[in-house]
Amino acid sequence: MKASQFLFATLKETPSDADIASSQLMVRAGLIRKIASGLYIWLPMGLRVLQKVERIVREEMQNIGAQEVLMPMTQPAELWQLTGRFNDYGPELLRFKDRHDRDFVLGPTHEEVITNLAQGELRSYKQLPITFFQIQNKFRDEIRPRFGVMRAREFTMKDAYSFHVDQASLAKTYDEMYDAYTRIFTRLGLDFRAVQADTGSIGGFASHEFHVLADSGEDDIAFSDSSEYAANVELAESVSMAERQPATMARENIDTVNMPTCEAVAEHLNVPLATTVKTLIVQGHTPEGEPQLIAVVLRGDHTLNTIKAEKIEEANVPLMMATEEELKAAGLHKGYIGVELNMPVFVDRAAAALSDFVSGANEINKHTTGMNWERDAHITRIVDIRNVHEGDPSPDGKGTLQIKRGIEVGHIFQLGDKYSQAMNCTVSGEDGKPVTLMMGCYGIGVSRIIAAAIEQNNDENGIMWPSTPDISDSLAPFEVAIVPMKSKEDTVMETATALYEELKALGINVLLDDRNERPGVKFADLELIGIPHRIVVSDRNLAEDKYEYVNRRDSEKQLLSRDEVIAKVSGK
């Protein structure tokens, strides 16, 4: 492509409403333009990047036998009503009526539509397993769209859905999809982690997220420094680092006036925060379903993980703290609640390992020192209900946990029969009887990948696209830019054009920057856009049969022969 015939929409100034590096750089580099909150136009430069991601995703889906379809973005509401998600999904689901007063939604995802398709097209177990995928725009009416295309209202997504007669078949396809995702993100040159995750509103019983590591990420992920263990912090398992020691202290009530926090009490007593416990009272129910309060106990230096706590059978979902009225009725005072209670007491593993600890005294302005389990208080059940910390032992026994921020770019689920059961999606089994299909769903945020890659790869001059094992997989809109310097002779442009044609013939995406601009302007634009390889053709260097080569990542200038230049940019 010749730059003089291409839309160069670079900007010198940073947009005032762009809040993170990727958003700023995508606008400045001329990849996107905002037309409304959360809505963006992909300009020619950006569309080249988007199409590269789509190509790699499409190739890997086809490599595992997934078949491409294209479903409508507009979906009839009755399908969502069948699964109950029309009311449950929340305000992110854009609902509207057509001129005939029929209800429709703009699809944020396509489980209902694909299940409806399977219901109509799949008849026999002999057609299974089968996987469909599409690459298509989705719409979620985010209350506060932010971070550019990272959290836009309309975005490009690859969603795939698999259908099976049994769990074993689903698990096999799930593993194949996991491996395909790993290949996709590896080909894209991203530093990523696959982590165990919560199934959320999609539902199901097994799930992994794929996160690109970046400081601007919205999720905390925990992973071992010595093994493959990784999980979203919401699900990362905590293990106790010590066994409970025998009691050595007698219990004693002490005055802690106006000290309702563990931090204040620990400072007052001059003891480590980790030797205190805090008791939270939450709403729950008996095995018979009758309302009751339950207590959850954590070490003073730990925080409650609500997703884990919701897995306590006796806890209500969503997890709700007891109201002031409920605490008053139970004779309890917030900030001074102890562990001797007339209700079920669920104790986190780390808190259960304590001896001679400090707790509330169930009396306002008082705490108790020298508390010990069994001797002084009963544990209903030991549970894992805390958020893990950096440096905690890895649950697999290998190494310690690191915690970093991550940007979710992919999510895979084993859904089971949640949707097929609701929509009566069955096939004839081997015995001729109806079999309700098992499902998997697998999403990749295609447009989000681009922002995540930039968050992970940028400097003060602009974008630095990830280095990829194969140059053809580079996310850069052009892998190579050739810059002919102005000259009175035609030789410079002729040589630059000849090199341009030669590299194109090798299948390399090349930009010939023949714009009527100063060299400094051209170089700044190419660095901003992130072109990995820059080749400068000039009279002076041609006199020595050399070309100036600069790699975007190190900015080191090298004088190379034609063959050396071709070897550099082609990786051969």
UniProtKB/Swiss-Prot annotation:
Pfam hit, one: HGTP_anticodon
Gene3D superfamilies reported in the protein's UniProt record: Anticodon-binding domain, Bira Bifunctional Protein, Domain 2
Entry's Gene Ontology molecular function annotations: aminoacyl-tRNA deacylase activity; ATP binding; proline-tRNA ligase activity
CDD domains per UniProt: ProRS-INS, ProRS_anticodon_short, ProRS_core_prok
Stored InterPro entries: aa-tRNA-synt_IIb, aa-tRNA-synth_II, aa-tRNA-synth_II/BPL/LPL, Anticodon-bd, Anticodon-bd_dom_sf, Pro-tRNA-ligase_IIa, Pro-tRNA-synth_IIa_bac-type, Pro-tRNA-Synthase_IIa_type1
Compartment(s) of residence: Cytoplasm
GO biological process assignments: prolyl-tRNA aminoacylation
Self-association state and partner proteins as the record states: Homodimer.
Family that this chain belongs to: Belongs to the class-II aminoacyl-tRNA synthetase family. ProS type 1 subfamily.
NCBIfam families documented for this protein: PRK09194.1, proS_fam_II
Protein's name in the database: Proline--tRNA ligase
Organismal lineage: Bacteria, Pseudomonadati, Pseudomonadota, Gammaproteobacteria, Moraxellales
